[in-house]
């Protein structure tokens, strides 16, 4: 039986919060777990509590190091895809990082194989994790980023659709359809600005790359905020949490599932799987560059 690779939300890395993870570890040897790069950024963001957070978060998995994998960060995927026009979606696991993590897990379990790896994470001598945390947890920048997507979507949608969203007259299926119709058009603007020929842009999107998944995810989130209202007055940290959650969701669409305690993340995951099960364009091959 092939292995199942399940993405774990960082909030499920504590034993008292994750009975389903404990059950899988003890009874389902073909179930493996994937930690996205963002999980380590979350674990290391607070320098004063870094060791305690790392040990506490990794203790649950420490007895099963050979069933744990690491997934590439989304920003690295986007850079690679835009440079090569090749999808990263089927090449997310990182062998070198996986081996480092497994040594670290053995150390957390009481061994000494990865002591130097753990110490390097804790001390962060080159400020690698501190720099990443500053980038990912820039709350104001994150709110501005999502606000830009919301503004673009408002301009693209008919006023009647916006009214239906605000009045909560559209169900989840209808919201997903809006994303399906709009994402390729918005992504086309990026390709056009980079001078990508239409045929290459079409072929690239057919591969369901990470950047298409990002556009789907951001539009789903934008629609949720348009419908709920209150974005302008929302605390920037709330938006950061939304975007961090969606990193887990997007990553999980490349594997076999997601374990999280957040229903809205499960809903977003199911919406993305729905979108990815369909052709990349609503029609056979529209002229996306016009």
Language-model-derived ranges and their functions:
Residues 261:
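Conserved residues at the C-terminal ends of beta-strands
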Residues 2-254, 264-290:
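Active-site-proximal, substrate-binding regions of enzyme catalytic domains
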């Amino acid at each position: 039986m092939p292995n199942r690779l399940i993405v774990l939300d960082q909030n499920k890395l504590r034993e008292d919060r994750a009975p389903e993870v404990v059950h899988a570890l003890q009874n389902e040897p073909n179930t493996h777990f994937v930690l996205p790069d963002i999980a380590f950024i979350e674990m290391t963001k607070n320098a004063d509590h870094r060791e305690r957070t790392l040990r506490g978060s990794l203790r649950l998995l420490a007895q099963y190091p050979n069933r744990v994998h690491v997934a590439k960060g989304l920003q690295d995927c986007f850079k690679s895809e835009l440079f090569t026009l090749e999808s990263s979606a089927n090449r997310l696991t990182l062998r070198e990082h996986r081996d480092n993590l497994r040594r670290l897990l053995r150390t957390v379990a009481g061994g000494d194989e990865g002591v130097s790896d753990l110490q390097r994470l804790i001390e962060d001598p080159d400020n690698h994790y501190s720099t990443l945390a500053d980038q990912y947890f820039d709350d104001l920048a994150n709110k501005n980023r999502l606000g830009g997507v919301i503004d673009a979507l408002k301009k693209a949608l008919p006023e009647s659709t916006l009214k239906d969203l605000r009045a909560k007259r559209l169900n989840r299926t209808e919201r997903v359809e809006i994303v399906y119709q709009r994402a390729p058009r918005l992504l086309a603007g990026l390709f056009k600005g980079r001078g990508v020929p239409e045929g290459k842009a079409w072929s690239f999107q057919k591969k369901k790359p990470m950047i298409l998944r990002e556009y789907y995810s951001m539009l789903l989130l934008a629609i949720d905020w348009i419908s709920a209202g209150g974005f302008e007055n929302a605390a920037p940290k709330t938006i950061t949490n939304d975007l961090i959650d969606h990193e887990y969701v997007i990553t999980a669409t490349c594997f076999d599932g997601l374990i999280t305690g957040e229903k809205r993340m499960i809903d977003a995951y199911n919406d993305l799987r729905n979108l990815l099960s369909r052709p990349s364009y609503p029609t056979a091959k529209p002229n996306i560059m016009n």
